[in-house]
Amino acid sequence: MQIAIVLYPSFTALDFIGPYEVLRNLPDTEVRFVWHEPGPVTADSGVLMVGATHSFDETPSPDVVLVPGGPGTTMVARDEKVLDWLRQVYPGTTWMASVCSGSVVLAAAGLLDGKRATSHWSVLSALKLMGATPVGDQRIVRADPDGKVITAAGVSAGIDLAMWLAGQIGGEAKAKAIQLMIEYDPQPPFDSGHMSKASAATKASATALLGKDMIKPEPLKAGVLLAWDQAVRRVRGRRSA
């Protein structure tokens, strides 16, 4: 089984590292980190770099695709090479998954039109703008009851998503063994990990932390252009109807 994890500049590291640690332990599995070309890709920290092992052209038929999120989402969601690859490989995949704002990329590729999806709380409104039905109260959302598109909420939810996929692919016993092997038994010392639980002050602080990355020139410009693209798409859709 081949698992392709999409990398791009300014991805969030935990979005893919958590799922990678789970999925790489499935039997007979090859994990690829894919981008336009092999080589280092810099995370949103500006310090951490991860090596893309394969290009999109070298990965024409993955069984599982996972798209992480991060401040670079708005830029990659306008990258036609990435979107075309997602559309091309989709029919042959067993699972098409995203973590955090990676669901915005799936939506930009047209894979979430009219479907249920989740994401980081800060971009749920963007999913609606892009034709999906946002779900903010679930960690893992299956787009259709029997479908193969799975989206996870923000950042740490990627581990839950990967554990779910491990159960679907390798069976419950294997998934439980992986869970114990990585000692995934979350017991956070604070209970503010969802908007429904956080205080107003915590929400304000978290929003400010996000803003440090999102107001940088490139993500900000790309976000505006992405919103423009979707507005034009809706207008053209109404005219052709």
Predicted regions: what is each one?
Residues D146-G154:
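A short glycine-threonine-serine/GTX helix/turn-capping micro-motif
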Residues M1-M96, V104-A108, L124-A126, T133-G136, ...:
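Extended, subdomain-level signal for the structured scaffold at the beginning of enzyme domains
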Residues L112-R142:
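A conserved active-site-flanking secondary-structure segment within enzyme catalytic domains
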Residues M96-A97, T118, V135, I150:
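Structural detector of well-ordered beta-strand residues that form the stable sheet scaffold
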